[in-house]
Structure formats: structure tokens, C-alpha cells
Amino acid sequence: MNRERRKALQAIVDQLETLQMQLEEIQTEEEEYRDNIPENFQSGERCERTEEICESLSDAVSSLEDATSSIEEAIE
């Protein structure tokens, strides 16, 4: 792989890492929100939806980690 393509791939890795950090921040905020839902609402629809959102964000973070690793392997 030539230097130009490696440089382009590294730029993509940098962008993915930035997106991952942003997602992790949102995930943390959503988890804090979920953890502070009053006990009498914890069995409700809102709490269930919040749990689904947290799981989806976690999956998205993992996917970005996988993508970043794959691209970094290609660069080597």
C-alpha cells in the first residue's frame, strides 16, 4: 500500500476514534439517566426504552472499535 492510501486510511481511523469518543460520552449520559430513574418508574416503558438505547450505543461503540482495528491492520 502506498503512502497516500495509508495516510487516507489513517485519517479515517482518526475520524472513527473521534466518533467513538462522542458515542461513549452520549452512552455515559444515557446510562446516568437510566441509573437515576426513580424506582417507581423502573418497570415502565421509558426505562425499558432507555435500556435498549444503552445497549444499542454499546453495540455501536463496539462496531467502531472493530472497524478501527480492521483498518489499522490494513495500514500495517
PLM regions: where:
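Long, low-complexity or tandemly repetitive, helically biased scaffold regions used
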Residues: 1-76
